[in-house]
Amino acid sequence: MITVNVKLPPRADLAAAERLVESTCRSRGLSEGMKTSLKSYPGSIHWHFTKEGERGTIEVTLWKKEKRLWINVHDNRASPWTSKEAGRLKSALEGAIMKINS
């Protein structure tokens, strides 16, 4: 499994971060397949994003309580595009979050 932590500024607007995850993924051509919460991270927001016509899933989790945002690609959901996109998505999210917090 690949896990990529997204750096959040100390005073990040986490309500805006939720919207930014969705809009940033959409702008990168990713489709939201699922939005839920993870029992192991109470109060978290967890998404599955896919790419049309491709196999594989990128998971993104925002845990406001702990001020954490991370991206996962599980081995059973990996494909050639997912590992590359995980790093690119990290950069895109960090840039978008920095813009709204500056």
Please place each PLM-identified region on the residue numbering.
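Beta-strand elements of well-folded, non-transmembrane domains
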Residues: 8-12, 53, 75-77
